[in-house]
Curated annotation (Swiss-Prot):
This is Negative elongation factor C/D. The gene is NELFCD. Belongs to the NELF-D family. It is found in: Nucleus. One of its GO terms (biological process) is negative regulation of transcription elongation by RNA polymerase II. The NELF complex is composed of NELFA, NELFB, NELFCD (isoform NELF-C or isoform NELF-D) and NELFE; NELFA and NELFCD form a stable subcomplex that binds primarily through NELFCD to the N-terminus of NELFB. Binds RNA which may help to stabilize the NELF complex on nucleic acid. In vitro, the NELFA:NELFCD subcomplex binds to ssDNA and ssRNA in a sequence- and structure-dependent manner. Interacts with ARAF. Interacts with PCF11. Interacts with KAT8. Residues 16-43 are annotated as: Disordered. InterPro entries: TH1 (IPR006942). It holds the Pfam family TH1. GO terms for molecular function: RNA binding. Keywords: Nucleus, Repressor, RNA-binding, Transcription, Transcription regulation. Changing K384M: Reduces RNA binding. Residues 21-43 have a biased composition (Acidic residues).
Length: 590
């Protein structure tokens, strides 16, 4: 445990041998020169004051202080007395206690973590950035102890926390760069000080972007927030990162994935209240079309569409030589159309409605072919049918006179229109806004409200919308529906679980099962609902199963509250059969 606390043991490796110290004394002319003219009595008093501080014999500067003291004519007896009287052996006592803990049976790793974590909390509590900077200035070079510290994860983590708390500390900024130089840039994404140094930031940006691309869609939710937070640290970091991603997005291989990440970061910035629309437009093709750029910029900045700017875009995109469709494929811009065309009660000028619909349909359906930065063809085959579908669903969704019963009569029409991805997204938003009304479920009498039935159709037709569908179902499942009695709440949650099972049957398996597994582990869900989910899933699945699915689903079945409590019909016992199949075909990993 001697290594648990920096400086805990004063050994020759750390302080140098006596012979080396003697050499230093001979070669210490520079320090002598700097002290030339100092009164010997003053030097002795200064040194004696240091010797009288607690555990000064453990300080790295002890040898230099001794040297100054003796060169000023100091007495060895005073030194020995002061150092011994003020030696309390804090570090040695820690080591002794650690040894005792290990001898009583505590794991050495656990003891080391305890000591290190306590030391970290003390350092964070008492850290003085001015003192840290002064030590650095006096050293004149990178201290050896600092290079030793950054080799260990525990102390790197300490520096990250300190750097967040003291962003102006030069010593910490230098240490972050040192950590980056040592190859640990993958750890620095959350450190704001890394964003102040271009060399460090570009290195961290490259590593983080590679991690997100390698992680794929399934890890995007985990990897993206930290990355977006780092990029959105300031205008300079946002512009630098988006400019780089804009260039990478032009690559044939992986370009679309980088563009997606850039758009997610734009959304993050917008949600945090930052208006990054001008940067978005400047990096795209909008700069070549100043009128379109001005119209788009005005609407994005205000967060709302308006007839005047929409008319400008409509004229341009109905001309013989329209701007590139990429110009209006800005996620934040398309979100504004969702609010204008699909939000219940949204008011839209009837004289301009066809313009709104045309631009949204154009962005969603037109396909362009480019060669060497020149457009060679525009395919508008699906523009008319997409416009028609958007208009039809808009009229149904925004008609406040149509209740749920009237919508049932229009289900076949809605199902036809939902086949268009842009309409499916609009319907999903409309369902979200509608069912999130506090009194919605209180007024419903059907076992499966029509709005939830529409989610099944969206799940069936559009794989890319599966995450958003599950997100909505989870939100509804976790909402307190206090206006309903207990039995009504249980029935509603069973209906929502039916939708999740349908989502699972359409291929979105692991995220759905992962969510139910979390519900079981958190113990915040009625166990009868978990049993219901298990029963419904067993009814729709059959071998062969993937290992990932078994690792997630089998522990749910083997839970004491689930196993043996699900009723079976006749001799057929799906739970036992599933467990037996898994035990004979899979090796379970705890």
């Amino acid at each position: 445990m001697a290594g648990a606390v920096p400086g805990a043991i004063m050994d020759e490796d750390y302080y140098g041998s006596a012979a080396e110290w003697g050499d230093e004394a001979d070669g210490g002319q520079q320090e002598d020169d700097s002290g030339e003219g100092e009164d010997d009595a003053e030097v002795q008093q200064e040194c004696l004051h240091k010797f009288s501080t607690r555990d000064y014999i453990m300080e790295p500067s002890i040898f230099n202080t001794l040297k100054r003291y003796f060169q000023a004519g100091g007495s060895p007896e005073n030194v020995i007395q002061l150092l011994s009287e003020n030696y309390t052996a804090v570090a040695q006592t820690v080591n002794l206690l650690a040894e005792w803990l290990i001898q009583t049976g505590v794991e050495p790793v656990q003891v080391q973590e305890t000591v290190e974590n306590h030391l970290k909390s003390l350092l964070i509590k008492h850290f003085d950035p001015r003192k840290a900077d002064s030590i650095f200035t006096e050293e004149g070079e990178t201290p050896a102890w600092l290079e030793q510290m950054i080799a260990h994860t525990t102390w790197r983590d300490l520096f990250y926390k300190l750097a967040e708390a003291h962003p102006d500390c030069l010593m910490l900024n230098f240490t972050v760069k040192l950590i980056s130089d040592a190859g640990y840039q993958g750890e620095i994404t959350s450190v704001s000080t890394a964003c102040q140094q271009l060399e460090v930031f570009s290195r961290v940006l490259r590593t983080s972007l590679a991690t997100i691309l390698d992680g794929g869609e399934e890890n995007l939710e985990k990897n993206l927030p930290e990355f977006a937070k780092m990029v959105c640290h300031g205008e300079h970091t946002y512009l630098f990162a988006q400019a780089m991603m804009s260039v990478l997005a032009q690559e044939e291989q992986g370009g679309s994935a980088v563009r997606r990440i850039a758009q997610e970061v734009q959304r993050f910035a917008q949600e945090k209240g930052h208006d990054a629309s001008q940067i978005t437009l400047a990096l795209g093709t909008a700069a070549s079309y100043p009128r379109a750029c001005q119209a788009l910029g005005a609407m994005l900045s205000k967060g709302a569409l308006n007839p005047a700017d929409i008319t400008v875009l409509f004229k341009m995109f109905t001309s013989m030589d329209p701007p590139p469709v990429e110009l209006i494929r800005v996620p934040a811009f398309l979100d504004l159309f969702m609010q204008s065309l699909f939000k219940p009660g949204a008011r839209i000028n009837q004289d301009h409605k066809h313009k709104y619909i045309h631009i949204l349909a154009y962005a969603a359906s037109v396909v362009e072919t480019w060669k060497k930065n020149k457009r060679v063809s525009i395919n508008k085959d699906e523009l008319k049918s997409t416009s028609k579908a958007v208009e039809t669903v808009h009229n149904l969704c925004c008609n406040e006179n149509k209740g749920a019963s009237e919508l049932v009569a229009e289900l076949s029409t809605l199902y036809q229109c939902i086949r268009f991805p842009v309409v499916a997204m609009g319907v999903l938003k409309w369902v979200d806004w509608t069912v999130s009304e506090p009194r919605y479920f209180q007024l419903q009498t059907d076992h499966t409200p029509v709005h939830l039935a529409l989610l099944d159709e969206i799940s069936t037709c559009h794989q890319l919308l599966h995450p958003q569908v599950l997100q909505l179902l989870v939100k509804l499942f976790e909402t307190e529906h206090s206006q309903l009695d207990v039995m009504e709440q249980l029935e509603l949650k069973k209906t929502l679980l039916d939708r999740m099972v349908h989502l699972l049957s359409r291929g979105y398996v692991l995220p759905v099962v992962s969510y139910i597994r979390k519900c079981l582990e958190k113990l915040d869900t009625d166990i009868s609902l978990i049993r219901y989910f298990v029963t419904e899933v067993l009814d729709v699945i059959a071998p062969p199963y993937t290992s990932d699915f078994v690792q997630l689903f089998l522990p749910i079945l083997e839970n004491d509250s689930i196993a043996g409590t699900i009723k079976t019909e006749g001799e057929h016992d799906p739970v036992t059969e599933f467990i037996a199949h898994c035990k004979s075909n899979f090796i379970m990993v705890n």
